[in-house]
Amino acid sequence: MTMRTCAVAGMFYPRDPSHLEQLLEKFFSVSPGAANSVGIVSPHAGYIYSGEVAARAFSTISPDFSGTFVVIGPSHRGYINCVSKVPWETPLGVVDNDTAFVESLDIETDEFSHRDEHSLEVQMPFIKYRFPRAQIAPIMMGQQDYPSAIRLAEKIGAAIQQTHRDVRIVASSDFSHYVPEDTAKSNDLYAIEPLKTLNIPEFYRRIAERGVSACGYGPIAAMVTVCGHLGAKKAQLIRYATSGDVTGDRHEVVGYAAISVI
């Protein structure tokens, strides 16, 4: 495979470049303020539901950034941790892969497993639109337990030291799935609270305590851990929303959060 082609264009986001660009321009028209994040949490649902929240997360990174985005997404099919070493197609153009950084991660390459996974792909148009010179290091995370998150964080940290890359880290995750909105909001905000002090063990404890069905809690944990090693001191919840804000159905929603680590 010489390029990872779009798998969910026309489903999760527009395939037409003009339509997609107009949509992203609308999403990025609302600025949250300072653009100084080391890492972010960004959702990966269809843009109609979570695109505005994702843009709020990416808006906390300066548009002048031209380094490497380490994008960590959960596998929705149970694959093991693996990386992709090829460029990624978007309707707005190709996002280049930082192959030297990816190789330094010492994680198995598996382009087949990346082929249909949407959790990483949904982030790419945001990167291409706002950071046209940036490269990517895509990581799919299969095992999301605490030790696995710490091991992945250590590999990312070692790769940063080895390559001296300027990086920003994106954890791709939605939060509660298919529960009443009051339940989603209560559980999600409860789980997010310890992230504000970069307290990953407490984050895991609260996820388990409430049974929060956040699909990318492992990527979140790995991202926050790396950011802490890079000097980050805290995280901020920039925006929280649910699918009910779009559909009007408050009985069964999915939660979305934009989180900035600084």
Question: What residue spans do the PLM features occupy?
Answer:
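Terminal, contiguous helix-loop blocks that mediate binding/assembly
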Residues: V246-R250, Y256-I262
